[in-house]
Design a protein with these regions (language model features):
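N-terminal "arm"/small-domain region of PLP-dependent enzymes with the aminotransferase-like
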Residues: 1-27, 338
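Hydrophobic "lid"/C-terminal helical patch
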Residues: 21, 64, 351, 355
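PLP-dependent aminotransferase class I/II
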Residues: 36-40, 45-51, 58, 111, ...
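Short beta-strand-to-turn element immediately C-terminal to the catalytic PLP-Schiff-base lysine
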Residues: 176-177, 190-196, 242
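PLP-dependent aminotransferase-like
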Residues: 67-145, 149-154, 161
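Conserved active-site segment immediately N-terminal to the catalytic lysine
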Residues: 152-186, 220-224
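Short secondary-structure boundary/capping segments
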Residues: 6-8, 88, 165-167, 182-183, ...
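Phosphate-binding glycine-rich loop
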Residues: 28-74, 80, 88-92, 98-100, ...
Length: 360
């Protein structure tokens, strides 16, 4: 079976895992040792003001939104995303306002953002879909003009760039996800990159909230001033993350090489565009008869996936009664095909041949 996702790991990850296991310091709510090192190195990598490591991309979104007053306020967000993006708004008592995406990229539509802004809007939450960056220049201008917070969902975008700057350098908060299926793989992990002018204060607040609200820690003494969660990253994830970060650009270069071949040789117009700045977490195509296509691909032992069923069509959010024709069409037809660095030349050839034969 050619896997849809497959982490690119080697002896360096194996060696550091054994060292960490034998070191007996596996986790610390205070975020010391490898967790702190990972924060510092990722901060340097994206050139942000600060970084706070957490235990998942979902935790990153929940935590970032918790330091913004969202109660009964609106957050503009695409529906073409993983459920966590929107749930984080709802969990923080905000109101998700679903926005249309661009048909050729799957990224949030700038023109539709403008139409969705109301007196209740307090933030915009774009998703760098598949690793292709949204138009952060225009979105940042909109947020600045309307005094809105910009929180980016960069779960797919580790290593991606926009206008020569790494994703992680632009928004007030940029939320990353690190998981075995992601470009930077960990058992589980996440991170918030902070660029807001109050970054020092926000980092301190996020540090407390990721460890059950614990603050003012001095020796055995500490205080709790507000609610928090058990969101801190463990040492195993951090040490793997450090090794993965060293080779992230190289792994993404392999993804781009595969993407360029797909772009040239897959005979479909409806597919993710080729962009040098894209991290290609996903390579998506649109097919007319998805269920039949998936069955045929699986018969050829090629694993494929669907990213995603639009969130506004989920039972939890159906009361919004919003119509998003572009999102809904993509949601009915989208299929992700393998694009990870472990693919061999023969794997790539087989995938292209099968897609061209089975897609309509």
């Amino acid at each position: 079976m050619i896997k849809l996702f497959d982490p690119f790991v080697g002896k360096k990850e194996e060696k550091i895992l054994i060292q960490t296991l034998r070191g007996h310091l596996w986790a610390s709510g205070a975020g010391t040792n490898a967790v702190y090192d990972f924060e510092q190195k990722f901060k340097k990598y994206v050139n942000s003001k600060e970084c706070v490591a957490v235990n998942s991309g979902t935790a990153a979104l929940n935590l970032a939104l918790s330091v913004i007053d969202l109660k009964n306020k609106e957050v503009i967000v695409p529906s073409l995303t993983f459920i966590s993006t929107v749930n984080a708004i709802k969990l923080n008592q905000g109101i998700p306002v679903f926005c249309e995406v661009e048909p050729d990229t799957g990224c949030i539509s700038v023109e539709n953002i403008k139409k969705k802004i109301s007196k209740k809007t307090c933030a915009v939450l774009p998703v760098h879909f598949g690793g292709l960056s949204c138009d952060l220049k225009q979105i940042s201008e909109i947020c600045k003009n309307h005094k809105l917070s910009l929180i980016e969902d960069a779960a797919h975008a580790a290593g991606a760039s926009f206008n020569g700057k790494k994703i992680g350098r632009h928004g007030d908060f940029v939320c990353f996800s690190f998981h075995p299926v992601k470009n930077l793989a960990m058992p589980t992990g996440g991170l918030i990159s902070i660029n807001n002018s109050d970054y020092k204060k926000l980092k301190k607040e996020l540090y407390a909230k990721r460890w059950c609200g614990i603050t003012d820690r001095k020796g055995i003494s500490y205080d709790v001033k507000e609610l928090g969660n058990n969101y801190y990253m463990n040492e195993f994830s951090a040490v793997i993350g450090l090794k993965q970060l060293e080779k992230l650009d190289g792994m993404n270069k392999k993804r781009k090489k595969i993407a360029k071949i797909y772009d040239q040789e897959i005979n479909l117009e409806a597919k993710i565009p080729f962009e040098n700045d894209c991290s290609y977490h996903l390579y998506w195509i649109l097919v007319k008869n998805r269920s039949r296509f998936i069955k045929k691909m699986m018969r050829e032992k090629i694993e494929v996936g669907v990213h995603y069923k639009p969130v506004h069509q989920m039972s939890l959010y159906k009361n919004n009664q919003v119509k998003l024709p572009v999102t809904e069409t993509i949601g009915e037809r989208i299929v992700s095909i393998p694009i990870h660095p472990n693919l061999t030349n023969s794997n790539i050839e087989k995938i292209i041949k099968s897609v061209n034969e089975f897609a309509e």
